[in-house]
């Protein structure tokens, strides 16, 4: 199961990219009879689109062993205003020797000074992430975690409860989204760092 592709990427003409938590199906837009669906997806332009396309092409080669070399798939990037904002695409895979995304979360939490707000549909953190969450909260950082009130899978709902209890005891403020199923995977820290993608906190 962990070898399936969980990425949700879209690149249009090599110029516009979409990345985040949304799957491609009507129920992920309109919800189901059981509950509405809440998600976060980003539309991006500029050099980061190349990085999203590279992630797709690596997956494509892994499956098909075909290199996409036609220049039409790599158009020149149009001039963009300098916003002073940096964007980076970080990938994770069971094939990779180092858990980059998990390590990124740990570093953000350990370097936070004011606040860290997080959303995830599934909360089964590794020991390093659990330690970083607890340490940040105990150090006075305003750590807030938003989860769905009801998970879409019974097992994950029950599995996450013991972890929730641990972080609440450490001072993390946990909020339960009531208006449907929260599928968003997002983190915001100190008005300076934001992450958005398809990685749940169940590394």
Q: Model regions: which residues?
A:
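Charged, low-complexity intrinsically disordered terminal segments
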Residues: 1-203
